[in-house]
From Swiss-Prot:
Listed cofactors: Zn(2+)
Protein name per Swiss-Prot or TrEMBL: Queuine tRNA-ribosyltransferase
Protein species of origin: Synechococcus sp. (strain CC9311)
The reaction(s) this protein catalyses: 7-aminomethyl-7-carbaguanine + guanosine(34) in tRNA = 7-aminomethyl-7-carbaguanosine(34) in tRNA + guanine
Assembly description: Homodimer. Within each dimer, one monomer is responsible for RNA recognition and catalysis, while the other monomer binds to the replacement base PreQ1.
Amino acid sequence: MFQFEIQATCSNTGARCGCFHTPHGPVTTPRFMPVGTLGTVKGVTTSQLAETGAQMVLSNTYHLHLQPGEEIVADAGGLHRFMGWDGPMLTDSGGFQVFSLGDLNRIDDEGVDFRNPRNGSRILLTPERSMQIQMRLGADVAMAFDQCPPYPATENDVAEACRRTHAWLGRCADAHQRDDQALFGIVQGGCFPHLRDLSARTVASFNLPGIAIGGVSVGEPVEEMHQIVRQVTPLLPADRPRYLMGIGTLREMAVAVANGIDMFDCVLPTRLGRHGTALVGGERWNLRNARFRHDHTPLDPNCPCIACRQHTRAYLHHLIRSEELLGLTLLSIHNLTHLIRFTTAMGQAIRDGCFSEDFAPWEPSSRAHHTW
């Protein structure tokens, strides 16, 4: 039911393109995945989302458990029917969000005891409970419950998080009982090479349908993140999709693809859109800026999205300055389209044998007149 086929590789780098087959359709790689935390990609309908080229969409176990609750989603027929999305979906375990909360009472080998920010009640989230919730939600891919250490953290603290993550992965694997849902493990280890090595080898030993690299983009220097990717990917099975969590900038995705990463997710495109910022080439444009007031050209002539096809920079500037919701929606659609087209273009370049020339190393200034 879940199969990953590699269709082409780059002879000069570790880049590869392929297809991850799921019960709700294929996911071509490399692939950027929009984040729909609460069963919605903020400000965008599912029809608009489909027009961006999105294939797989993420939702958040922690947030959906709090509101509306996995029972309501299950009663609707699962997350796909609940939100009206018939393509592949992935749910993260909720671990990152729980560990990001300030009001934690207990983290131990059993799980995490925390206070519900909505009503103050106590919640115990364990590997088994995370699997129960994710199985009820019914996404194509469920992520294992892991402990993501903060940055910076001591070696002892990161080692303890690794030990706990590996033990919890075993419990997740035992508790996960849906054949139509793939379980992905998560590599931790912070910025300590020997711990990343240990975690990669341990998670790979579970022989799961896919593996993610977690604990990146949490405040560490960018070059350290690059080094983690370079170190970890050769230790992961070549015939499984590799997912770098929380990454969504062009340069970081290009560097990661050059080192064998297949999948990405990030809230960045919609967050920027909601703040009036557009991604164009390798730049971020603040559409509030007065320089766009009389600019009646498309936002990006190379982009096929509705914002670029039907509207001008001056109109988008007007919407943002007027605080019209349409402006935020149009910029979110554009930014999503931009990142998805970028990963699609990397895949095509791998097939065409020109990835190393066009994307690795990739710098924004060299791609100002892009054609993707």
